[in-house]
Design a protein with these regions (language model features):
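A short, conserved, highly charged catalytic patch centered on acidic carboxylates
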Residues: 1-106, 116-238
Length: 238
């Protein structure tokens, strides 16, 4: 079975079981450990996966990461797990502390459904505030699977991942901005169209006038793109 098929099996399992998972430990056993195994690591081999690895800081003792993926006796990926219904926004500072205390270049914060991948692009050994990759197991794209595959034991290459991490991180932020403005164009986004259609001039009144038109126009463009792709697909089938 190839990697994609294995991941799809895990996705089906998550969809069926997510409402029955009562604890964080159950989340780890049912959702997270199968993903680690799918990445080619033996979860019962301490040379590959260390559960509850110490990540102590000078002023904080007893800090432990849920899982550390190992290579050549060094951690390469830290995984901090939460219950599958937990909001991950509440827990990123915890992973930041663990990241500083280790030599790993990558950290993952997950609730077994959403996986947020972090590294230290801005300052060495200081985890970035923004993840460079966010994967939702219940809304998985082919590209998500390809990005996950880069962390597979057989394909893992730290420099290759780092070389694409910044682009991925920026892509996430651009998509978030576009999504916000597609839902409700803000003043700056709307002014772009006002200026370009009025010889560089704009007023608050024009911005308010254009805002619903911009929103409607975006929806029409998206619908046109979808219709064009469907028409092409139908022609290819015929």
């Amino acid at each position: 079975m190839d990697f994609k098929d294995t991941i799809q099996q895990i996705v089906e399992k998550i969809a069926k079981q997510k409402d029955s998972i009562a604890t964080e430990e159950a989340t780890k056993n049912s959702f997270v450990m199968p993903v680690i195994a799918a990445l080619g690591y033996d979860v019962f081999n301490p040379f590959e996966v260390v559960p509850e690895m110490d990540c102590d800081l000078v002023k904080r003792k007893g800090e432990k990461i849920d899982y550390a993926i190992m290579k050549d006796e060094n951690p390469i990926l830290l995984i901090e797990c939460k219950h599958c219904k937990q909001n991950l926004n509440l827990h990123d500072t915890q992973l930041q502390r663990y990241f500083v205390a280790s030599k790993a270049r990558f950290g993952v914060l997950t609730n077994g459904i959403e996986y947020r991948f972090y590294t230290d692009l801005e300052k060495v050994n200081i985890m970035d505030e923004k993840p460079f990759l966010v994967v939702n197991m219940l809304d998985l794209s082919d590209n998500d699977i390809e990005q996950l595959k880069k962390f597979h034991k057989s394909y893992y290459n730290e420099q290759d991942i780092l070389s694409t991490a910044q682009e991925l991180q920026i892509t996430i932020q651009v998509k978030e901005m576009l999504n916000r403005n597609f839902q409700m164009p803000d003043d700056e986004f709307t002014r772009y169209f006002v200026r370009n259609l009025n010889d560089g001039k704009y007023t608050a009144k024009l911005v308010d006038q254009y805002r619903p038109i911009v929103k409607k126009s975006i929806a029409l463009v998206i619908n046109d793109i979808i219709s064009d792709r469907l028409n092409v697909a139908m022609k290819n089938e015929n």
